[in-house]
Amino acid sequence: TFKPLLYTLAVTDAGYTPETNIPGGPLTLGGKTISTEGGTMAYCLAKSLNGAAWHLMGTIGVHRTIEFARQCGIAAKLPPYPSIALGAAEIPMLQMLQSYTMFPNKGFNTPPVYFTRIEDKDGNLLYEFPISQSKEVIGEADAYTMVKLMQGVVQFGTARRVNSYNIPAEKAGKTGTTNGNTDGWFIGYTPELLAGTWVGCEDPFIPIYSSNSGGAEMSAPKWGLFMSNVYADKRLPYGKVTSFEQPAELKNNPIFAEQNFANIATSGDSLDAEENTDHRDDLMGNEEGDVTDDKLLKDSAAKKIKPAPKKKESDY
């Protein structure tokens, strides 16, 4: 689930768009060579391709990525290594949720408020807590670009299963499986509500032995069930806004037309999901010969790719 932060920096700092191509090809990590898929940025995020995240980390840089994560509300320890792009850091769910608030909130990050008010048994207000102060961390157009990219995850990628639930609103999000396959995540949102689900063991040393039990297969359906129940409950104030609002500056951009975006989000190398490919969500693996941080740093320096051309007004 950390990958969207890296992709955000590709948009804001390097000028990437959903149709920017990220190359695939052989990638050697920890003495093991895998065949990585390439494709458009929309395709790579939808499929959660590790090789693409690796290339983006080489472009953006580790320290800039950590700096941005801090701006988004992530206070957890982030090791200064490229492996954070592949799920190597332990980040609490609430911190990840706060970092995602900028996407549906048009670029504004909002700290969580755990209690909004206290009432007595008769419903009399005893105390009302102040509303969190939001701060802008990215522009509205960049936030909407990321919303579209993360809608691709739900429409064409690893979180397609949430579409089987009756949620009468547009959906976007990201699956995740942490390093060592100990946690399965899904963080998703509609225009009105952001929520996250986690599957794992209290003891982080106990892995989920099947990669089919990670974010895509276990966490995403739980999110879908929760959200469908929320929207079905007429006592709750959700369902008034069902579509993400497109900024005026992007309305004439052909990239965001539905059919065009569908074509962009499904444009990849289409490798078979074999053991030597990177169809493993955020998972780095836990086999003998895994990647070390020193090796990651060395490979990162060798695998840098050129930033995309800076965005011009005509791009938006």
Predicted features along the sequence, with ranges:
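A penicillin-recognizing enzyme superfamily signal
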Residues: A46, P92-M93, L97-Q98, M102-F256, ...
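Active-site SXXK
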Residues: T1-I22, C44, S99-F103, M146, ...
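Long, low-complexity, intrinsically disordered segments
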Residues: E288-Y316
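Mid-domain, small-residue-enriched loop/turn segments at the edges of structured enzyme/sensor domains
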Residues: T33-S35, G61-Y100, G107, P111-Y114
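Gly/Ser-rich catalytic serine loop of serine hydrolases
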Residues: T1-F2, A88-I91, G215
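Active-site catalytic microenvironments for nucleophilic, acid-base chemistry
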Residues: L9-A14, T59, R64, M102, ...
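Conserved catalytic neighborhood of penicillin-recognizing serine enzymes
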Residues: Y16-T65, Y81, N109, K121-G152
